[in-house]
Amino acid sequence: MSSNFLNPVTTQTWANGRHLVRCVKVIQETWDVRTFCFMADQPILFFFKPGQFVTLELEIDGEPVMRSYTISSSPSVPYSFSITIKRVPGGRVSNWLHDNLKEGQELPVHGPVGLFNAIDFPADKVLFLSGGVGITPVMSMARWFFDTNANVDMVFVHSARSPKDIIYHRELEHMASRIDNFSLHIICERHGLGEAWAGYRGYLNLRMLELIAPDFLEREIFCCGPTPYMSAVKHLLQGHGYDMSRYHEEAFGPTPPEVRADVRELAAEAAEAPEVPVADQHQVEFTATGKSIRVSPGETVHAAAAKLGLHIPKACGMGICGTCKVMKTAGEVEMEHNGGITDEDVAEGYILSCCSVPKGDVVIDY
């Protein structure tokens, strides 16, 4: 490593896009959770909003795979970033990462993106609610407030299956012991044989919440966890007068069944749809490859590329991860995304190909 590696004059700033990074450390957080730390060989300041995520570009068994993970570190430590991953039984990507990703290995990442963050929703009093590995985005937020000595009153409530499943336990206790504006509360569903636990047991309920944060109605809430956990939290808050415009969430887990059903239904409808007259079709041109194709109304730019054999990376297919971002140099599209692209990128001409439908002839630099 050269002596000027961390020279601010030569250091670049992380921009939303594709970057090659190297794994520099692997930390065993719990028996089934690991943190992977990354840096770039060419020094980059990894600036992001606490709570945002990146998408890893992997190759598993010779097949390209994209998967998104929240950044668990804080932008206050800018020369590296970390992601924390739970080994999921039967999970293709999480198991591969636990078994194969070692220090020194390089991989491309896309991002950072995400609307779930602590910067866009400033507040003097916050309540962090997390379940399982859903702790990662709110931990990034808490670390940011802690490191920057922010004048923010934080209540941090984490739910885990058992004491051995508590992620970042020692660090959380350290934070709570160092500053007065960080109140830590951990709820364990159960405890195993030989495990001592004097804290809250069971599941988060109204009585617990009122004991932990009597003023929860006055706080901005950031919540993340498995879908059942999120549903229970929302039901609890909605039933007791909380202003849900101050509630922010990020779900961890597989795509909900209703979303998968909608996608299958749309695919079936498209397959049965009659052929569209040429006059009603739009041309999509990809200038970098010199290819073009006419598409029917409703077809996305990504679908057009796929028909031409062009591989635009994609992970979520719902405008969330930002992986499929491309530059539009001409024409107009209708883009309905879910936070996977910034207003600045849109102003420059970028679109998310997975959720952008041409409104006329379109030219893409790809």
UniProtKB/Swiss-Prot annotation:
Binding site for [2Fe-2S] cluster: 316, 321, 324, 354
Statement: the UniProt record of this protein carries the keyword Oxidoreductase: yes
Catalytic reaction annotation: glycine betaine + NADH + O2 + H(+) = N,N-dimethylglycine + formaldehyde + NAD(+) + H2O
Domain FAD-binding FR-type residue range list: 16-119
Disruption phenotype: Deletion of gbcA and gbcB abrogates the ability to grow on glycine betaine as a sole carbon source.
Highest taxon, organism lineage: Bacteria
PROSITE patterns hit by this protein: 2FE2S_FER_1, 2FE2S_FER_2, FAD_FR
Cofactor note: Binds 1 FAD per subunit. Binds 1 2Fe-2S cluster per subunit.
Name assigned to this protein: Glycine betaine monooxygenase reductase subunit
Organism (species): Pseudomonas aeruginosa (strain ATCC 15692 / DSM 22644 / CIP 104116 / JCM 14847 / LMG 12228 / 1C / PRS 101 / PAO1)
Lineage: Bacteria, Pseudomonadati, Pseudomonadota, Gammaproteobacteria, Pseudomonadales
Encoding gene (name): gbcB
